[in-house]
């Protein structure tokens, strides 16, 4: 798709994060399998569920925009995943590996925070006010759905930082 307008750029950004979220959802179970810290594993398990919900929200955003949910290859996401897998695969010590897993997970979170923040800013600038029925919650604008995902990503980043600072990095050192 040729990007000729800001709206085209917005759609491309949605497709980019859609692809990235789906790739990250495939990567989280691998990280869980290689992690040894129980709190880290449980945190990834909970975030995998959040990631699946974020993908569902993106499906709803696409539908509200009259688009078929689809991704475009996101080289940044693939690069983060490849680098993480290579790094984690080179580490035998479980504590050091956990520290690398946290750092890799935070690289993913920071990418997602960037993408969702950008998409929200673009949607606001474009005046995108489309709504999605959320059942008992009522209707939410697509900006609200993107904000929910952004808030979850920021929360996951805070949790990873706290776990790294309080336990994982100390054990690795």
Q: Positions of the model-derived regions?
A:
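Amphipathic alpha-helical hairpins
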Residues: 1-173
């Amino acid at each position: 798709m040729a990007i000729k307008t800001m709206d085209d750029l917005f759609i491309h950004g949605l497709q980019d994060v859609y692809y990235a979220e789906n790739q990250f959802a495939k990567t989280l179970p691998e990280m869980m399998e290689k992690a040894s810290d129980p709190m880290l594993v449980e945190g990834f398990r909970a975030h995998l569920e959040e990631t699946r919900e974020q993908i569902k929200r993106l499906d709803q955003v696409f539908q509200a925009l009259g688009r078929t949910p689809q991704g475009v290859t996101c080289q940044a996401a693939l690069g983060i995943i490849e680098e993480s897998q290579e790094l984690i695969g080179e580490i035998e010590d479980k504590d050091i590996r956990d520290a690398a897993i946290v750092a890799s997970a935070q690289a993913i979170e920071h990418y997602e925070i960037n993408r969702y923040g950008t998409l929200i800013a673009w949607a606001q600038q474009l005046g995108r006010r489309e709504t999605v029925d959320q059942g008992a919650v009522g209707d939410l604008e697509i900006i609200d759905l993107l904000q929910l995902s952004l808030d979850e990503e920021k929360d996951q980043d805070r949790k990873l930082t706290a776990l790294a600072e309080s336990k994982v990095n100390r054990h690795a050192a």
